[in-house]
Amino acid sequence: MLIRRYEGNPILTKKDVPYPVETVHNAGVVKHEGRYVMLFRSHLRNGRSIIGIAESDDGYRFTVRPEPFLTPATEGDFALYEEYGVEDVRINPLEGEYYLTYSAYSRYGVRIALAKTRDFQRVE
């Protein structure tokens, strides 16, 4: 199999995001229920990172949802470790669920975090 860079790159830019972001990068894509789901990292104006979500039927033309998919926790156990952002998500399908590994960034440095979803609507 020969892999070629898509000549229409980039397939997603900050102009495609319906909320204010400074960047779009470091995406992961998986096929879920016949559609492509992309989770991507963005920086907000305050420098914090969030994870956005976009969907596509063909893997080239993506539509970004109106709200971010994963934002830093503001309360609970994760808030202390996500205060500067959530970054660089990876999507790992396993037995009908998707395990999401990502970097939680805070004054304590970078830590590995884990979340999961079945439907890319709700996250545990």
Model-derived segments and spans:
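Beta-rich carbohydrate-recognition and catalytic domains
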Residues: 1-22, 26-84, 92-124
